[in-house]
């Protein structure tokens, strides 16, 4: 069941759902709006190959802390960014992340993203650029997070490798299963 603004406010007031900072316009009719943080990472324009079975992406990412000048997402470029808000999910809520339609109308796109029950941290999001350069700014509301209640609290809440992440978090490889297809 998707939570209404009323249900979301109850979760927040009972401190079952943490959103920090929480703005007056965060809670919407059927979800919450989240803002761009000030960190953006883009892939270096090199011909090096990232081997997903053993390489991290630290050597191929260029990361920036952006202030009032904004950040330009180039045509068809894949960019990692983060939410300003730190969130903590209870064991009976999951989040479905959507790009706000204003940014989709500029041609930006995000892949389907699910926030697991029990997750804590800033949300790292991949943005895919439009056919034209698009400039975005820290603090702009860019995501709409739909909250859904599970039929019961999950047996094993999220405790994975991205738990507690702050800012943009590049992919983390689990080398123990990297070549097991």
From Swiss-Prot:
MF-aspect GO terms: dCTP deaminase activity; nucleotide binding
Pfam families: DCD
Presence of the UniProt keyword Hydrolase in the record: yes
Binding positions for dCTP per the UniProt entry: 100-105, 116, 158, 165
Gene Ontology BP annotations: dUMP biosynthetic process; dUTP biosynthetic process
EC numbers, comma separated: 3.5.4.13
Region (Disordered) location: 160-181
Enzymatic reactions: dCTP + H2O + H(+) = dUTP + NH4(+)
Pathway info: Pyrimidine metabolism; dUMP biosynthesis; dUMP from dCTP (dUTP route): step 1/2
Keywords for the protein's UniProt record, in alphabetical order: Hydrolase, Nucleotide metabolism, Nucleotide-binding
Residues the record marks as active site: 126 (proton donor/acceptor)
Keyword Nucleotide-binding: yes
Subunit relationships: Homotrimer.
Role of this protein: Catalyzes the deamination of dCTP to dUTP.
Family to which the UniProt record says this protein belongs: Belongs to the dCTP deaminase family.
Entries under NCBIfam families matching the protein: dCTP_deam
Record's protein name: dCTP deaminase
């Amino acid at each position: 069941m998707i939570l209404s603004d009323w249900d979301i406010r109850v979760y927040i007031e009972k401190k079952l759902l943490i959103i920090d900072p929480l703005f007056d316009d965060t809670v919407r009719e059927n979800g919450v709006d989240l803002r761009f943080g000030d960190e953006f990472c883009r892939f270096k324009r090199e011909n090096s190959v990232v081997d997903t079975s053993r390489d991290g992406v630290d050597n191929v990412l260029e990361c920036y802390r952006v202030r009032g000048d904004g950040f330009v997402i180039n045509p068809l470029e894949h960019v990692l960014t983060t939410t300003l808000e730190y969130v903590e999910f209870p064991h009976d809520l999951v989040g479905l992340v959507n790009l706000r339609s204003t940014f989709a109308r500029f041609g930006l796109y995000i892949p389907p993203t699910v926030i697991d029950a029990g997750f804590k941290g800033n949300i790292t999001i991949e943005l895919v650029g439009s056919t034209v350069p698009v400039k975005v700014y820290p603090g702009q509301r860019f995501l709409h997070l739909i909250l859904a209640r599970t039929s019961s609290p999950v047996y094993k809440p999220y405790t994975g490798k991205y738990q507690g992440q702050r800012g943009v978090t590049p992919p983390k490889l689990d080398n123990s299963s990297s070549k097991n297809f």
